[in-house]
Amino acid sequence: KPWATESWHEDVEGYELWDGDQLIGRFFLDMHPREGKYQHAAVAQIRDGISGQQAPLATLMCNFPRGDELMEHSQVVTFLHEFGHLIHYLFAGGHHWSGVSGISTEWDFVEAPSQMLQEWVWDYDTIAQFAKNAEGEVIPPDLLDRMIAARDFGLGMGTRRQLSLAA
């Protein structure tokens, strides 16, 4: 839910994540570009949580269009990927082991929650609930099928490269 607090810029919005009456964490959404701002999408830890004493605090930074401009599919993938990191951090950031969990975990796992979350934009039933063009029309199923085919083209070559790097 919205969190009424000050932030470093008027465009930045604060939110709280609750589970019933228990505060899980707080976060800022810094979604739009501006002069001097970090140019990529990322989640930054602001304050670790301390079990029973303080909730974790983080920010999700992106550079998406303002106002009525529509987001591109790749931007939605990016948002959900980074939001996965944010949720991972918040849910793991308020207990005794928060320093070695959430986005502070081993590199072979740190991307897992965010990669799972970003997959939702490749599922037609999910994307049809929110992905609309300027006229309010839902993305056609055949267009998403073609986007998936384009994404998957040459996937084996990328896997082969990663295997060669691991050798």
State what each model feature region is.
Residues 1-166:
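Cation-handling catalytic/transport regions enriched in His/Asp/Glu
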